[in-house]
Amino acid sequence: MKEAIIEWKDFSFRYETQQEPTLQGIDLTIYKGEKVLIVGPSGSGKSTLGQCLNGIIPNIYKGQTYGEFLIKGQVAFDMSIYDKSHLVSTVLQDTDGQFIGLSVAEDLAFALENDVTALDEMKGRVYKWAEKLDLLPLLDQRPQDLSGGQKQRVSLAGVLIDESPILLFDEPLANLDPKSGQDIIELIDQIHKEEGTTTLIIEHRLEDVLHRPVDRIVLINDGRILFNGSPDQLLATDLLTQNGIREPLYLTTLRQLGVDLVKEEQLANLDNLSISKGQVQLQNELAKETPALQSLFRLEEVSFSYDDRPILKSLHLDIKKGEKIAIVGKNGAGKSTLAKAISSFIQTEGRYLWEKQDIKGDSVAERAERVGYVLQNPNQMISTNMIFDEVALGLRLRGVDEKEIETRVYETLKICGLYEFRNWPISALSFGQKKRVTIASILVLGAEIILLDEPTAGQDQKNYTEIMEFLEELHQKGHTIVMITHDMQLMLDYSDRVLVMVDGELIADTVPASLLSDPELLVKANLKETSIFNLAKKLDVDPLDLTAFYKERREGCKLN
C-alpha cells in the first residue's frame, strides 16, 4: 500500500495583501518515493504551493489558510521551520541566492554545521556528495565562479547532504543552456532512483523535464488543480495549449504532418510512438531567394579580457539591416560580454563600424541611440513609477524639449501597444507589458537594433508568445532584432540567422535548421538537438528537411 507523505485536503490559501485566494480547494496527495512535475502558467499558484511546502509560507509570507495540509501525517503549519527543513529541501531557481559558503566545500557543509555534526562525519558526508555529484575538483573554488550547470550541482549537493526525504526543485532549468539543463534532469532522475526521495519539480519547460520519466503531472491554473495524472494522459488532451504551456515539439510537428495521434497511448516518449519509417514523405520546397541586406553594424577584431583571462577573442561580426539573429552557446561562452561590447558598456580592442562609419568612440548614451539593450528582467531596468515617465526618462536626461518628448513618447507608446496605459503605474502591469515598457524606453531614443538577453526566460507560453509576437511586429516595422537565448525552439521559430559562441569565439554563423541538424556543432556549443531531429531519425527523413518543414508550417507556408 502506498504511503502518503504530503497531503493537501480542500486546502486554500490567501495572502494577507490580497482579497482573493491564490490557492483554492486543493486536493492533492503525494506518495513516498514519487516523482511529480507541477506545471502551470505564470501566476497560476504553483510557486505558492511550493512555498507552502518548504515553509516560506507562513514563515516569510503571511496569509489565511483553510482546509488541511499535512507532511508525514503532521500539520505542516504547526511545524517549526527547523523541523520542516529536515523533511523538505529546496533547490531554488536562482542558485546564487542559495550559496552561503566562500568555497564549494564550505557551502556543502553549511547545513551540517548548523546541526552541530561531528567534524569527521561532516567531512565524510561532504566528500560523499561531492564525489556523487562530480564536485571533487571544485571543492576549493568559489560557487559564484562556476558555470550554471556546476552551480546547480553545488546547490543540489548542499540540500542532499542533509538527506531530507522530500526534494523540491523550483524551475531548475531556467538559467541553463540546453545541454546543462539535460544533464541536471538526468542527475535529478539518478538521485531520485538511488536515494528514493520524493521529488517535486516546478518547471515551465515540460518537454525538457520529460527527458526522464515522471510518475505524474499536476497542472494548476487560477489556483486550482485542472489535471492530476500521467504524462501520457495529459498529452492526449488540449489542456496544455489551453493553459499556456508549450507541448513537446515532436507532437506539434507530427500534427503538422497530419499524423493521427488519437490511438497513441504513450505520447510522453517519442521512442514509444507507433509511427514508423516511410510513414511520412517530405517534398523539398524550392529554396526562396533571400534579398541582399545592407551592413548596419560591423565588429572587427573585437577582443576583451578580464583579469588577464580572454573573454572575447578577435571576433568578426556583421549585423545586417533587418535581420533576426540568435546568439547561442553554453553558459560562460561570452554571449553576455559580446552584448555589453555591442552596447558600449565595456571598452574593448577592435573596430566598430556603423554603416561603414567608425563609432568606437561612442559613449554609452550615444550607442543607446543606435542599439537598445533589453535585460532579461524588466524590473532591473525600470527607474520610475509611471509608464509615461519611464519612456520619457532617456529623452529628459538628454535635455529634449518637453513638447517634443510628449510627441515622441506618445508615438512610441502607440507602436508598442501601450498608449491606453500611458498614465498607469508600472506596478499594475504584467511581466510581458513591463517588457514592452523597457523596449519602448529604448525605441524612443531611435535605436535601430534591439538587443535582448533571454527575452522569454522563465515565461509561460502566453507571455512568451506576447513578447515574441511584439518583437515580430517591430521587425516588420524595420528594426533589427538580436537575441541571446538558450531556447532552441525560440531560435528556430523567431530567428533567420544564428551565431554560435564557444569560449569567446564565434565558431559558426548559420541558419537555425542547419545548426539543429549538426550533432557535432551542437556538442561543441553545449546545445542539444530538438526532438524534431529524433523524430526525423524515427521517420527516416532528413532532419534538415523536417526542421524546414516545421518552420514553414509554423509561418503559415505549405510545401508543394
From Swiss-Prot:
One of its GO terms (cellular component) is ATP-binding cassette (ABC) transporter complex. It is a peripheral membrane protein. Coiled coil: none annotated. Residues 6-247, 297-528 form the ABC transporter domain. This is Putative ABC transporter ATP-binding protein SP_0483. Its EC number is 7.-.-.-. It holds the Pfam family DUF3744. PROSITE patterns: ABC_TRANSPORTER_1, ABC_TRANSPORTER_2. Disulfide bonds: none annotated. The keyword Ribosomal protein does not apply. It comes from the Bacteria. ATP 1 binds at G40, P41, S42, G43, S44, G45, K46, S47. SMART domains: AAA (SM00382). InterPro entries: AAA+_ATPase, ABC_Co_transporter, ABC_transporter-like_ATP-bd, ABC_transporter-like_CS, ABC_transpr_CbiO/EcfA_su, ECF_ABC_transporter_ATP-bd, P-loop_NTPase. It comes from Streptococcus pneumoniae serotype 4 (strain ATCC BAA-334 / TIGR4). Belongs to the ABC transporter superfamily. Its main location: membrane. Keywords: ATP-binding, Cell membrane, Membrane, Nucleotide-binding, Repeat, Translocase, Transport. NCBIfam families: PRK13648.1. Probably part of an ABC transporter complex. Responsible for energy coupling to the transport system. It is found in: Cell membrane. One of its GO terms (molecular function) is ATPase-coupled transmembrane transporter activity. ATP 2 binds at G329, K330, N331, G332, A333, G334, K335, S336.
